[in-house]
């Protein structure tokens, strides 16, 4: 199935952007690097999100923050359950989405729903919700009754303290419009914690890569991919060219 998804993804890249790098010889942390308009993306294609290991996630994050290229994982399912169109799955700040959702994103339609621990939710723009509720002449209690939630829940939506589950979010969208929700940004590099950096650090601003063509990545006044494997060296050079980095032999 991954071959079918990969071919479909490559068709989207061909029709909507430019393929800068690809290697499907084995499952690396990434499958390809693509460019859509001015933005480059490091992309992994897998049937299920569980096929992308935690070490691959760390590699993606390190590559992203050092090359300023966001990471996107294109998958069909999460833990065996179909990932719906318009819903993204966030794992350690790396975005997973279906190919249909990616197509929507490329057409300018940003996703608003996210999957977390089996529950689909949306982030509500609290200020807009409060303004539109007041414009409609609705009290907190009345809106809560219409939504089937407590007054306290609506109050917390307006303060941005909690996200709304799918059905409640859909009710709010029907009442006040889609701009009541916050769009999920997919063109930003994932956040990397100091603990994650420390777990991979092998030198000054140098970090080990475990599921990539280069063995490490470092930052001086530029991004450098470090290669000690002769068999992977050529692909490391191709990856560096795609991401605007340089290569250094270990």
From Swiss-Prot:
Q: Which domain of life is it from?
A: Archaea
Q: What Gene3D superfamilies does UniProt report for this protein, alphabetically?
A: lambda repressor-like DNA-binding domains
Q: Does the keyword DNA-binding apply?
A: yes
A Gene Ontology molecular function term of the record: DNA binding
Q: Which residues form the HTH cro/C1-type domain?
A: 129-183
List, alphabetically, the SUPFAM superfamilies matched.
lambda repressor-like DNA-binding domains
Q: Which residues bind DNA?
A: 140-159
Entries under InterPro entries matching the protein = Arc_TR_HTH (IPR020886), Cro/C1-type_HTH (IPR001387), Lambda_DNA-bd_dom_sf (IPR010982)
Keyword tags: DNA-binding, Transcription, Transcription regulation
Q: Which Pfam families match?
A: HTH_3
Report whether DNA-binding shows up as a keyword of the record: yes
Protein name as it appears in the record: Putative HTH-type transcriptional regulatory protein PAE1627
Annotated source species: Pyrobaculum aerophilum (strain ATCC 51768 / DSM 7523 / JCM 9630 / CIP 104966 / NBRC 100827 / IM2)
